[in-house]
């Protein structure tokens, strides 16, 4: 079985603690929950891969449209930990397909002044322009529900096919800490929808 590796064309981390801060060109992606001054804080990250690159791999190596044969395949999301601190006995990381477009921006964590020219916890793109939708989503789409933390993206939680469109990995402090998620259902649905299959 051949292995094809692709890298994201854009990514960014969203922070509740810094609701308008953009981190689009920061080298680190962060997923965490923590307390700051007795307030719960969250960070999550967005990753986008080239649809053209995904479709090319699918069309060239997985699916044959002439014979309607689809080869056995799987898609995995791999992220490698730079630093891990404060792990609970068990920690769970979940991945969902994002619903809607977003702008990566050019910010880095800790820029002073704060960079706001891309997505953040509150905004999908340049700060002050378009907020993440908080209601009236499309079918199978949701977002954060906490009133104090409005924002943080919108994502798919299901599909008309009934396939599970999320992935998760549970870590404990003795496990390897690199992320390795099976995102086959997410990718197959994404490809089929992008091609109107």
Model-derived regions: residue spans:
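Secreted, disulfide-rich extracellular signaling modules
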Residues: 1-197
